[in-house]
Amino acid sequence: CTYCMAEDMQFLPKKDILSLEEIEDICRIFIKLGTRKIRLTGGEPLVRKGIMQVINNLGEEVGNYLDELTITTNGSQLEFKAEELYNAGVRRINVSLDHLDPDKFREITRWGDLEKVKRGLDKAREVGLKIKINTVAISNFNQNHLAEILRWCGKENFDMTIIEVMPMGDIGGDKR
């Protein structure tokens, strides 16, 4: 989204990014140290090739050494991954959604297919995932629509968290 990533952001070289094995190893170390809840976030974790194997492996610990395995996602892959997530032991997801207007949604996400995300949310609910919507409050963008999102979440029986923008350095000159 525009508030997280500048248009001309330079990505790390692949060799500098944690491998899936390293991610799983770190999670297992935390579990051995007594961590009871693991949340996988991103970027967008569900587009990472091979991530479902990590989720399946960590999901084997749910009910034993792990109380909860959750995913924070932009929702773009839920339509196709929700059932697999549930079967892997995920019971709750957080979905980032900052506007209910399709054009505004596309503007903030840069890819935005709000209807695809909504279909994914429907699928997630259908398979039994508990859903929390994360909405970043952005002045001059969605501050007058937060109540609308809250009402929609209530109607859909989704939990909602309103998040304040956290300045993370230069994100392309955006003043949010």
Which residues are covered by each model-predicted region?
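Conserved C-terminal portion of the radical SAM core fold
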Residues: L33-R39, Y65-T70, R91-R92, L97, ...
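Conserved alpha-helical substructure of the radical SAM core
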Residues: T2-L69
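Conserved radical SAM core fold
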Residues: M9-F11, P45-V47, G75-F80, R91, ...
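Aromatic/hydrophobic pocket-lining residues that form the small-molecule binding cavity
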Residues: I23, I51, L78, V117, ...
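Short amphipathic alpha-helices and their capping/turn segments at secondary-structure boundaries
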Residues: Q77-A88, L150-R151
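Alpha-helix N-cap and loop-to-helix initiation/capping positions
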Residues: K14-L18, E22, T109-D113, F141
